[in-house]
Structures are given as structure tokens and as C-alpha cells.
């Protein structure tokens, strides 16, 4: 599946290939895993504090819309996707990256 236009903001820092980190960790196989699990990536204390959080649709819906409110203290500079259709498109795309 082709990445939606809204995903361009994510690609500024994240890669979708397994084990290929950018400024942020790879998003490959993100769904169903716990936060802060990409091997070798140095996560913020905020991500480590929420390391038991499973990355699922309810969590990512909130996180993509407002990362700072969903995960206080995280280092991501991304302000969030304000359009709910963009959030849905990015979620659908992320589910295919595995």
C-alpha cells in the first residue's frame, strides 16, 4: 500500500524498513508491540515510562492527534494530525508495514 500524503510528516524522522532508525525509531511492525522496543534505539524517559503500553488503534489514534498529551514528556516535535481523516489514513498505512 502506498503511504498517504499525511504520512510525509512521519517520514521526516521515521523509516518503515525493519531495523532502519532515523531520528525516530523504525515504524516497521509497530502494531501490537509495546512502546520503546526497537532494538538499539535510545528512547526518551517518557517512552520508557509507558513501555507496557501496547501500540494499538485506540492508542495510536490519540497519539497521532496529540503526541504531547498522549505521552507527556516525549521528545517528538511533531504537533499531531488535526484532521481525523489523516489519522485514519496513517493508521491504515501503519497496519500494512510488517
Curated annotation (Swiss-Prot):
Keywords: Electron transport, Heme, Iron, Metal-binding, Periplasm, Photosynthesis, Pyrrolidone carboxylic acid, Transport. Gene3D superfamilies: Cytochrome c-like domain (1.10.760.10). InterPro entries: Cyt_c-like_dom, Cyt_c-like_dom_sf, Cyt_c_1A/1B. The modification Pyrrolidone carboxylic acid is found at residue 1. The keyword Heme applies. Heme c binds at residues 10, 13-14, 76. Its main location: periplasm. GO terms for biological process: photosynthesis. It is found in: Periplasm. It holds the Pfam family Cytochrom_C. PROSITE patterns: CYTC (PS51007). Cytochrome c2 is found mainly in purple, non-sulfur, photosynthetic bacteria where it functions as the electron donor to the oxidized bacteriochlorophyll in the photophosphorylation pathway. However, it may also have a role in the respiratory chain and is found in some non-photosynthetic bacteria. Belongs to the cytochrome c family. This is Cytochrome c2. It comes from Rhodoplanes tepidamans.
Amino acid at each position: 500500500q502506498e503511504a498517504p500524503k499525511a504520512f510525509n510528516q512521519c517520514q521526516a524522522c521515521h523509516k518503515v524498513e525493519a531495523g532502519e532508525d532515523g531520528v525516530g525509531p523504525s515504524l516497521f511492525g509497530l502494531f501490537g508491540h509495546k512502546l520503546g522496543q526497537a532494538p538499539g534505539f535510545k528512547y526518551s524517559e517518557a517512552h520508557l515510562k509507558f513501555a507496557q503500553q501496547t501500540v494499538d488503534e485506540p492508542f495510536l489514534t490519540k497519539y497521532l492527534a496529540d503526541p504531547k498529551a498522549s505521552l507527556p514528556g516525549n521528545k517528538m516535535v511533531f504537533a499531531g494530525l488535526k484532521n481525523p481523516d489523516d489519522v485514519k489514513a496513517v493508521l491504515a498505512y501503519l497496519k500494512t508495514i510488517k
